[in-house]
Amino acid sequence: MGRVRTKTVKKSAKVIIERYYPKLTLDFETNKRICDEIAIIASKRLRNKIAGYTTHLMKRIQRGPVRGISFKLQEEERERKDQYVPEVSALDFTQNSESGQLDVDTETKDLLKHLGFDSIPVNVIPVTQAQPVERGRRFGDRPRRD
């Protein structure tokens, strides 16, 4: 069973990651030495807990942004995504379809009309509902005994 991490461990690991992100790695031993160098931590046990949680958070950061942790590299990446402009506009009907029209549903057509893009030729296609996939149940996927 897992252990509960104290507020001290979580806060200090978060601060260490925000300030020293480029130095940290996915290796506990390396992070432990870095924690030793950059912070005055009262006990060896507390240092190990902070280094362990730092390593855990670093692994989570590798998978994607982590709530509550913001560092320069992550902010730059977010800024780049916000400033993204596609090569070909989705509203450029000359390049997007063979028929010279956009294929949209009724809601999108209403939205385009509301935004003043009603001069764009559109082809309304009804939306089809995807069938929900039957997921297996736990306990060996046995059928229920009703």
From Swiss-Prot:
Gene3D superfamilies on file = Ribosomal protein S17e-like
Q: Which GO terms describe its molecular function?
A: structural constituent of ribosome
SUPFAM superfamilies linked to this entry: Rps17e-like
- Keyword Ribonucleoprotein: yes or no? yes
Q: Where in the cell is it found?
A: Cytoplasm
One cellular component GO annotation, for this chain's record? ribonucleoprotein complex
Q: What family does the database annotate?
A: Belongs to the eukaryotic ribosomal protein eS17 family.
Name of the protein described by the UniProt record: Small ribosomal subunit protein eS17
**What is this protein's gene name?**
rps-17
